[in-house]
């Protein structure tokens, strides 16, 4: 360009080379669409939620899972940690996962239950020789060996681990999923300085987006709920403030509606505002069986407050 030509002598050859490396890559919209298709997605093992998400949890994006305690956020994360390892012959990613646990919620026995159920399912549906061969190595031991667990006791440890993560990902190219359960806990419990917390969260959000796009992995973060007063009434909203709400590409709200557990997609660039029923079983995150005459398993969100 003219600017580069003008300053060539001042920059020198080495400086010019570095500058050119930093220039943005120009791609067409069609190329971007093709890249997204190639990235793939991770099944949630809920066909209704997968359908609402246009195929499952997107790779290369940041997804936030919000909800009150006990509604199933961690259970969905554990399910995804197993599902990301589904063999390629079944349409899976055959990847590995990094699970950053800030609350001590990772329970090995529960992971074992979910893994055993997934292995049983694919053993039953395996048809051709390639799929049957894949099941020879897709077992409990291989699933557990592909989960890298990182226990973070405070926000300093969490930020430090994320700082080291790019080097780890270069050494482990099969990692396709990063889970942080939860991102809210260390910041809300241990950091009272709101100004500092906001700056750190902004930096963290940028870092997660960079990790997702540069390393082509799905980033899943869980968030707690807090109370906000609006029109003299209190409402439950995702924690960490409105600025944090821009961190994710997709936001899924898990909530109770009476006796029903509902997963609502409240933010997404491509999915309609939809809610589907789910429940947590001994085998993991699953659909709720719909009545036989039900042709519409998804529940339109007719009223939705801005989250």
Region locations from a protein language model:
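Intrinsically disordered, low-complexity glycine/charged-rich regulatory or linker segments
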Residues: 1-5, 9-25, 32, 269-271, ...
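The Walker A/P-loop phosphate-binding site
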Residues: 3, 11-133
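Conserved inter-motif catalytic segment of the P-loop NTP-binding fold
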Residues: 92-195
